[in-house]
Structure formats: structure tokens, C-alpha cells
């Protein structure tokens, strides 16, 4: 019987919130590059902000009509703005989530480095021990009166890179809050989350090729220990969200290609050390975005096959590149939407759109939503055309899900395309739909289908 595994998405959603309340230590083990660190840090910041930053935790969602979902979204935005105004009036101290946690990265630590020896000439025992800055930050947090009753989080990344001696120091710290310099931190208000790569000695990870130290069983037995697996669905959901540049976290080329060819994800090649996983895929995505930016600057730039291979390996790279070539030849978003003066997609262009493969239609519609899109959604005609594409474009279910998710997740970014699409009410008169309503109604038809 193999060890049970869970996705990082589910750990963030249903596991970490409970452990945060109890302050019981957590250990997360999984292959490198699957997003452990990014997802844990995002969850940590979210939990701390909800607990101490003045934001209220969201209630569990039940099935709602479109009107209920839209009203709830708008009410949530209004409430957040009202809280911001009240905070300014009261001249409250600005909450900084960075003050409430720290990260110890084992991959950057020399051996036995949790303790820093130094000479103190004023002490009888001249050789003293100090602690690393991350532990000092925790001590300083608990020394402040305004933090009474509040929790501090220590995230230990790459636990399996620590030597056995350092792991024993961590074990004592997890068990009692004992620091290497002999001082104690209040264990009931200290939450430790450790992450690492599982050694081959753990069942189910015999083929693991990540270099690690064996993790002390004393550490494992003092934590709630979870084994995680690579999760394409969760990664693509994150990839379709907008970042602070108004772009999707993953380049639409990569999102579209993996919708078409999910079998390319997390496949190791015995003849190559490179493969497509969250970390390498994200770096490839950054490369594709930079090529796109160079084109916009008028430079002669094109993505290169060998550059794609450099991130994901020759075999996967060759297959992936053929899909990217296909997307390169697509009609552009500007061609698809035409003039701002037209309130409908040109019939010939609509037929071209319908004839595209599902992943190609997905790519074009996600490019339409990005803030870098050439489409001006302050023009009602373009709202009408996007609505038409959703209703008449014969979309795959996954595309409707991704579009609805993108709009709802990014609606709070003022001035973004998502917020414009959410706020636009002009299309509702005469029984017509706001484009977000079209998407949500589309989703209602397929609710329950995965």
C-alpha cells in the first residue's frame, strides 16, 4: 500500500487554516518544483491578514444564482472600500504581514548554521552562541506588547537540506520553542511549517532523484506530516489568475498548450534531467512573456526551440514547440474584435473562431481578458462582442470556467479589465446580459461536470 498524497491546493484550502488555529507544527514533503513554497507562503500571508489585518474570513460558498454571486462580489468590494476609509479616519497603524512570519531556507544554509558562535570578552564563558536573524525576528515579535495573544509563523523551507544535527535543533524548537541560544519562545503562539523533499527511504518516493538528508523520525513524529503530489489542475488554476502586471501568472501559450496536452506535465525522461513541472514551467512562461515584450518594443524577437528545451527537456520541448508554433499563426485579438465602432464580430471572423481547436479558442479569449489586451472594454461595443464570443463561440467547459474564475478573482484590481467587465451594467437593459453573467450562465449549464 502506497502512502496517501494530497495536492498543495487542498492543503492550502482545508489543512493549513485548521493547523493555524491550533499552532500545531506541520511538515509537507514532496518532489521539488511542484509549488510547495509559493503556495504555503501565499496561504500564510492570507491567514495572517484575515486574523490580524482587519479583513474578515470568507464564508463557505453555497450554490448561488448569478445575481446572488454578482451582488455578493459587489458587496464585498464595497465593504473592503468602507473598511479602508474607516482605517484612514482612525489613523490606524498600517498592518504589514511581513512582520508576522519569517522564512528559513535550508538550501542556502552552510552545515550546522542555526547557531552562530561569537566571542564575548565581558562574559566568564567567552565563547557564546547567537541565533540566526530569522530567530531574532521571532524573538523581537514576542517582545512587543502589541503582539500579545498573536501568533508568529516560522516557515522552514528545504528541511531535507539540513544536516541531522541541525534537524535535532529544529526538533527541540518545534517541541518546546527552545532556541539554540537557550531562550524559549511561547510555543502556543508559535506555528512552524516545514517543507522538504522526501528521501528515497520513504515508500512511494523510491525513484526520487532529489538530493536530500534523511529526515529525522523525531521531527516527523512531532508534526502533522503530509505528502504532496504534482497537481496540474491546481497549477493551471493559479496560472490563469492575473498578476500585478495585469498578465496571467502563466503565459497563455503555456496554459493553452497544457490544456491540449496535459500528458506533458511532470513526465521524467531517463535520457534527460529536465522536465516540465511548476518551477520550470513558470520560468519558461517568463521567457515567453519577455519575447512578447521585445516584439511590442519593435525588436525582432521570436521564441527559440532550444530555449524551450532548456527549461523542459528536448523530448517535451519538441512536442510543446509544435503547439506554440500553431498558436503563433492564429488570428490576433485585434483582428478578431475589429473596429470599436462595430457591435458584432464580423461573420467571417466568427466562423474562423469557431473552426479553431478548443485550446486555440481558450488562448484567444484569455488574451482578450488580460489588461495588456488591445481591446478597450470601456467601449460597450467591445463588451457586446466578448459576450457574443462566449454565447456563440462553442466554448469548451474549461474555457468558461477559466474566464469566470479570472474575472471573479481579479475584479478588485481597480481599472483592470476584470473590474470593468464586472461593473458594466449597460448590457442588462432589454433583457440582455452583462458579459460576466453570460459566462456564469454558461457555467450553470455544466455545473457538476468536471
Task: List where the protein language model places each region.
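C-terminal regulatory/interaction module of P-loop NTP-utilizing enzymes
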Residues: 1-450
Amino acid at each position: 500500500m502506497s502512502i496517501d498524497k494530497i495536492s498543495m491546493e487542498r492543503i492550502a484550502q482545508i489543512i493549513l487554516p485548521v493547523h493555524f488555529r491550533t499552532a500545531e507544527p506541520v511538515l509537507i514533503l514532496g518532489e521539488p518544483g511542484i509549488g510547495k513554497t509559493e503556495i504555503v507562503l501565499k496561504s500564510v500571508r492570507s491567514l495572517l491578514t484575515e486574523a490580524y489585518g482587519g479583513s474578515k474570513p470568507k464564508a463557505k460558498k453555497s450554490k448561488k444564482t448569478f445575481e446572488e454571486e454578482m451582488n455578493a462580489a459587489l458587496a464585498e468590494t464595497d465593504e473592503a472600500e468602507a473598511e479602508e476609509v474607516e482605517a484612514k479616519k482612525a489613523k490606524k497603524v498600517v498592518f504589514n504581514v511581513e512582520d508576522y512570519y519569517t522564512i528559513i531556507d535550508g538550501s542556502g544554509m552552510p552545515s550546522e548554521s542555526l547557531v552562530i558562535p561569537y566571542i564575548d570578552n565581558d562574559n566568564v564563558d567567552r565563547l557564546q552562541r547567537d541565533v540566526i536573524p530569522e530567530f531574532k525576528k521571532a524573538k523581537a515579535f514576542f517582545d512587543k506588547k502589541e503582539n500579545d495573544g498573536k501568533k508568529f509563523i516560522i516557515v522552514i523551507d528545504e528541511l531535507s537540506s539540513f544536516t541531522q544535527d541541525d534537524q535535532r535543533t529544529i526538533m527541540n524548537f518545534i517541541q518546546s520553542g527552545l532556541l539554540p541560544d537557550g531562550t524559549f519562545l511561547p510555543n502556543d503562539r508559535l506555528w512552524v511549517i516545514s517543507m522538504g523533499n522526501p528521501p528515497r527511504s520513504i515508500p512511494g518516493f523510491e525513484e526520487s532523484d532529489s538530493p536530500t538528508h534523511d529526515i529525522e523520525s523525531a521531527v516527523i513524529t512531532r508534526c502533522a506530516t503530509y505528502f504532496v503530489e504534482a497537481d496540474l489542475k491546481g497549477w493551471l488554476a493559479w496560472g490563469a489568475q492575473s498578476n500585478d502586471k495585469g498578465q496571467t501568472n502563466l503565459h497563455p501559450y503555456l496554459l493553452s498548450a497544457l490544456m491540449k496536452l496535459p500528458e506533458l506535465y511532470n513526465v521524467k525522461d531517463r535520457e534527460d534531467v529536465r522536465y516540465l513541472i511548476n518551477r520550470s514551467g513558470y520560468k519558461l512562461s517568463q521567457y515567453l512573456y519577455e519575447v512578447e515584450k521585445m516584439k511590442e518594443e519593435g525588436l525582432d524577437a521570436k521564441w527559440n526551440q532550444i530555449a524551450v528545451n532548456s527549461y523542459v527537456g528536448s523530448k517535451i520541448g519538441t512536442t510543446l514547440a509544435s503547439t506554440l508554433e500553431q498558436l503563433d499563426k492564429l488570428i490576433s485579438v485585434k483582428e478578431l474584435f475589429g473596429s470599436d465602432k462595430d457591435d458584432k464580430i464580423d461573420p467571417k471572423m466568427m466562423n474562423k473562431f469557431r473552426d479553431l481547436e478548443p485550446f486555440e479558442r481558450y488562448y484567444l479569449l484569455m488574451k482578450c481578458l488580460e489588461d495588456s489586451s488591445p481591446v478597450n472594454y470601456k467601449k460597450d461595443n467591445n463588451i457586446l462582442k466578448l459576450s457574443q464570443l462566449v454565447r456563440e463561440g462553442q466554448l469548451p467547459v474549461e474555457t468558461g470556467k477559466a474566464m469566470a474564475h479570472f474575472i471573479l478573482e481579479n475584479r478588485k484590481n481597480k481599472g483592470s479589465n476584470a473590474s470593468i467587465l464586472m461593473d458594466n451594467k449597460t448590457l442588462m437593459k432589454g433583457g440582455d446580459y452583462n458579459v460576466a453573467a453570460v459566462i456564469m450562465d454558461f457555467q450553470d449549464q455544466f455545473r457538476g461536470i468536471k
